[in-house]
Amino acid sequence: MMPMEKIELTAGPDASGRLDAWLAGQCAELSRSALQNLMEQGRVTRGGSCVNKKDKVVPGAAYCIDLPEPQPIEAQPQNIPLDVVYEDNDLIVINKPKGMVVHPAPGNPDGTLVNALLYHCAGQLSGIGGAIRPGIVHRIDKDTSGLLVMAKNDAAHQALSAQFGVHSIHRVYHAIVYGNLKEDEGFVETYLGRDPRDRKKMTVVPQEASGARYAYTGWRVLERFGNFTYIACQLKTGRTHQIRVHMASIGHPLAGDAVYGPRSCIKSLNGQCLHAKELGFIHPATQQWVQFDSPLPAYFTEFLTRLRKEHRA
């Protein structure tokens, strides 16, 4: 049996609130409910003594989390409807709905895009991504909608991954951001890494920071509404939360994004207003350029309609 992994954390002088909430903010890999379960099992301690999920965090205190040996996750086929944009023997392009997780993970063992793909493709997916990520070449966030390409065999997976690696994939996202951008177009070029204060979040970091990765987002204004701006973003790189962090870093977070934007989110959006609209690449088998366009989903068009009405009033 493998030894248990330990996570050791020290609360800063300004740490406050419930301990389970504070720990969840420090550990990107553990949800609050998972931490509560570990506390009930006596796996979270302070100074060698077990803590309670209702305890308050103590500034300056050292906490230790003993993680049990992880149980293997095996993705199972599930008959979940898919919006298939294109499909052949080598790949499949999907229009992912908002709210769907791409692949299984602790806390999301099923109901994911991978579960749906395993059923739809009858197991014919590339194995390079491993048992829980078959066919997955790239990902988008749970609350981001839009286009994704998945590989059905290893040759297609390698060819698509190579294109992502040299940033030759065409990817355009549509978004609505808070505020009125001063220019009609521009770009954000930074390095991104984990936020040291909250491991679930990404942030702009110095180039020399541990884990720093280069990120470039180009943007142009499509429509202005005074307090909001409708934009198109073209990605050169595809880092975790890239558009969300980049737009927030210049003072224009995405509408509905309660993580990187205002706490008072827009309930009708159920998360950030971000849609992966265009996707283009060289087909691995034919070597021909193919490009796909996804119509804006209902949540996006309804919010646009509302903004247009309010702006004209």
What is each PLM-predicted segment?
Residues 2-313:
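RNA pseudouridine synthases
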